[in-house]
């Protein structure tokens, strides 16, 4: 099939367009298209074919295109030449709805490195090397500050948030975790309890889906699970949380809390943890291992040998996939954790970063997309169907990116060694 308005082109390529979404299926017709065509012209071609098949979509919908899992960012001729592909063979080009580019929204400047970030509604929770955690809104207004740790805050997580109160957890280099309550609309914060049990730095923390348990991982090689219930009882041990910290009620007391469960098995420090299912946690760190644990019986179900130190992991909310960032020239590896024979399956790799991948976060609304942050100062937005190049590379940081978050679909948030929180806003595409 040759489109009429393309007959003026002197060089034609045989192209088969294949839709990844049935909504946009054009039946895979074989087309003769000008080699000069790029994404804009191919999008127009798809619209023409859809209209010919009586499929109505808004004119504003644009498409991305990929050949052999590599995003097309050049003309067809440029791509074919750069990859030494035959111009005599049929070239299969897959297409899918284009992701709108993230728009810069705001920069929040801090006094020290930002080690962790988590967004919730219109709020950002961040932990810093200055020993504090803070909550800001997206406009950069500081809502609350949490002081009490004796060293860096390495990890933060929201436990709950309603119109009146928010509960958070912080994990610190001082070997402790603290649960805090913030009275929304005020600067009032209270340390509810201090979790003690680790003997070295607590590097990361996460919360289960029901918000009843916390999991922490540490340089002491241990995994500890704690209850989020900090109810005070008559026999609870209490102590001042900070000599200089007072509220309207006077010096606050915090409950000392011990872990419910301790899991051992890693042979070196642990840097990353996620809790994708109610009875399953996944941990990773310096022993080159990703470990999957059954929290109900407290056993290590399976291991993935990455052969590199793992700095960050994320899990797809939609499918059995684990993405891991490690100490090897910026490669992100995606694994299927289901064991086949005696091994897990390496599904694919994402390659574009030029340094250590420090943090990852999967989209909560799109099973194909995730974001990554790296010591190369960039944040990248990926579609795993096109693993050879990111959809977008965001270059707002001036030093290492240490944390990324995509908990809220409309905001991509990152923190780094440049003392900055960068906020990017997304247009959430309407998809079928």
UniProtKB/Swiss-Prot annotation:
GO terms for cellular component: nucleolus; nucleoplasm; preribosome, large subunit precursor. GO terms for biological process: maturation of 5.8S rRNA from tricistronic rRNA transcript (SSU-rRNA, 5.8S rRNA, LSU-rRNA); maturation of LSU-rRNA from tricistronic rRNA transcript (SSU-rRNA, 5.8S rRNA, LSU-rRNA). One of its GO terms (molecular function) is ribonucleoprotein complex binding. Keywords: Nucleus, Repeat, Ribosome biogenesis, rRNA processing, WD repeat. The keyword rRNA processing applies. Pfam families: NLE, WD40. Belongs to the WD repeat WDR12/YTM1 family. This is Ribosome biogenesis protein WDR12 homolog. It comes from Trichoplax adhaerens (Trichoplax reptans).
